[in-house]
Amino acid sequence: MAEKEATVYIVDVGHSMGKCRGGRTISDLDWMMLYVWDRITTTVSTGRKTATVGVVGLRTDGSSNPLWEKDEEESYAHLSVFQEIGQMLMPDIRKLRDLVKPSNTNQGDAISSIILAIDMIVRYCKRLKYKRKIVLVTDGRSTMDSDGIDSIVSKIKEEGIELVILGVDFDDPDYGFKEEDKDPFKTKNESVLKILADDADGAYGTLAQAVEEMTTPRIKVVRGIPSFRGDLRLGDPSQYSTGLTIQVERYYRTYVARPPAASAFALSIAPPKGQSTAESSVTLQNGDSTVETANASNNLSGVRNARSYQVIDENAPGGKKEVERDDLAKGYEYGRTAVHISESDEVITKLDTTAALEFIGFIQSENYERYMNMSTSNVIIAQKINDKAILALSSMIHALFELEYYAIGRLVTKDGKPPLMVLLAPLIETDFECLLEVQLPFAEDTRSYRFPPLDKIVTVSGKVVKEHRNLPSDDLLETMGKYVEDMDLSEFDENGDPFQSLALEDCYSPLVHRIDQAIRWRAVHPTKPLPPVPKVLEKLSHWPEELVKKSHDSLRDLISISAVKKVPPKAKGRKRRREADKPLSGLNVDDLLRGEKRLKISPENPIPEFKQTLANTEDISAISDAVKQMSAIIEDQIRQSLGDINYDRAIEGIGTMREELIAYEEPGLYNDFIRGLKEKLLDDKLGGDRREMWWLIRKSRLGLIDQKALDISDITEEQAREFLSSRPTTV
């Protein structure tokens, strides 16, 4: 279970925070909120109910907090609780965004705001185990009552609260920042806050450093969850007394980090008055989070899916009737054919397995090829607080390590699951030892391919040719070698010893972290453009400038020797306007063999025949006729489709038609077709509800041909995007 957290952010919204200082183009409050929003949205993005947040406003126009309401003590005036401690969601972020604005007063005590935050944490956490934290962000220009700081420090330590104080333009020798011509009043306040942070064993620093460190992605620390708990067996203990059984646990060692998945929403259409919209059972089963997110916006609603099953029935309206899922037999696709397998036959394909990790063999480590790894790595450790298992597994690990052997195992993570072949390699460190585990392929998964050699050509007669136009010359090999040396990333220190210039811990995935940054930014700033990509994420997207300069000459020589030439860009509309090369004899073999032009496209082989028909004509009427034939074939495929069995063929046909008509510069023919097809799909005129087909068209981006795809089109990009919505359009 994840550790419970309670964090209170104290945000200074005084009148002085509305000014721009330090050469910045944004106010001190907006600059400060860059850090605060980053921390809050990071917490919200985890989705954990145990990660709670509270927000206190310092130097607000009014006073709204329990300590003020109790006795109306002046020390707690101009302090407002913007957000009580609890899980923060998107509606809370929107509410907080409206509250955080510069006030009209500079009255408010920062020390008292810390007391208020302590009170909030004590009341919420009680005596339960929480990770408690207070973050004060201020410009240090408010009045402060430093009496009783010692008791505040004692309470912070007693409650186990971590105190972090960040200041706008605070002096920080460790970071190397000092504000010139500082107001003596602010200097005194900085000194008071620094003493408070130091005495409470907290952190004190300047806001500039915190904002700068925001661009560096934070490494997510996750709690290990065992993916397998069971026996590691050598031999069968149930049959042989010499069999060995060790209780072990399996954890991820490496895991692929993926960006957040997108959720599907549609523009909502308000129902008639007095009519409510019913929630789909599928949506409700998937949880309430999607529905809450959709309802939070007035313009979006969650996408609801409904699946129906139909079979051909000549007596039913439309030639098909709907059936229940329970009335259907299970089948598998074999090409375009649905193959039925009965339950009795399907049992044969399933192995009756028992959860265990079993040794089935050993190999020398030098004989193992790294390309056999098929998965991320896991670690196998002995069962915790089981000294006998720890000692037994340690003996096995040391034996494999000393003999330089790897073990081959058969892993079944749960009863009834298919087995996996795994490699087990020993790992021994100073304070840790385990077996590293990766998945191996079965014999049926391996394919052996033979490729021709790269340094010679063997003719049909068996002659070996070492000088050929397809083989690199000695000069080319030498120049390429020089270029590779100049591109070497190795770096050396002043003593000539190599060091790692691209440390693994300093390399981040731009895809994962940029999308995460964009989501968190858009949650707070729905209309502002995204901030620029941080340099730490761009570092691996561009060549180092020093390396480019170093390899410039060798690259120029390589281009010259290898005779690299720029390929001209592909011309649009080339198919109709291209002049064919005239043979010297005057006889065109293609014309002689082509025969008569194709007039009719058959439904059995529509795509090749459609292309052939277009290739054999330059008459616009013939092209239009071919488009009409192809349109009728696609509509018949959809109309006669049993479920979605013909949808892939129809999508392929639509894509081919779009590609060919772009090449022939006839966007109008395709746009007229796709408009009519959308209308028929949404009006259920192609054999019932075919909205899933329209969803596939949208997914494949087969909408209108716009001006971006073809300059002569009269459809703008905005019109093309609007057309791909699920609503009827007049584009």
UniProtKB/Swiss-Prot annotation:
Where is it located? Nucleus; Chromosome, Telomere
List where the protein spans the membrane: none
MF annotations from Gene Ontology: ATP binding; ATP hydrolysis activity; damaged DNA binding; double-stranded DNA binding; helicase activity; telomeric DNA binding
UniProt catalytic activity: ATP + H2O = ADP + phosphate + H(+)
Query: Pfam families annotated for this entry?
Result: Ku, Ku_N, Ku_PK_bind
Enzyme class comes to hydrolase
Keywords annotated in UniProt: ATP-binding, Chromosome, DNA damage, DNA recombination, DNA repair, DNA-binding, Helicase, Hydrolase, Nucleotide-binding, Nucleus, Telomere
Q: What is its EC number?
A: 3.6.4.12
Question: What Gene Ontology cellular component terms go with this record?
Answer: chromosome, telomeric region; Ku70:Ku80 complex
Which superkingdom? Eukaryota
Q: Which residues form the Ku domain?
A: 238-486
Single GO biological process annotation from the record = DNA recombination
Q: Which family does it belong to?
A: Belongs to the ku80 family.
Q: How does it assemble?
A: Heterodimer of Ku70 and Ku80.
Note the PANTHER family from the entry.
KU AUTOANTIGEN DNA HELICASE, X-RAY REPAIR CROSS-COMPLEMENTING PROTEIN 5
Report the function annotation for this chain. Answer: Single-stranded DNA-dependent ATP-dependent helicase. Involved in non-homologous end joining (NHEJ) DNA double strand break repair. DNA-binding is sequence-independent but has a high affinity to nicks in double-stranded DNA and to the ends of duplex DNA. Binds to naturally occurring chromosomal ends, and therefore provides chromosomal end protection. Required also for telomere recombination to repair telomeric ends in the absence of telomerase. KU70, of the KU70/KU80 heterodimer, binds to the stem loop of TLC1, the RNA component of telomerase. Involved in telomere maintenance.
Name the record gives this protein: ATP-dependent DNA helicase II subunit 2
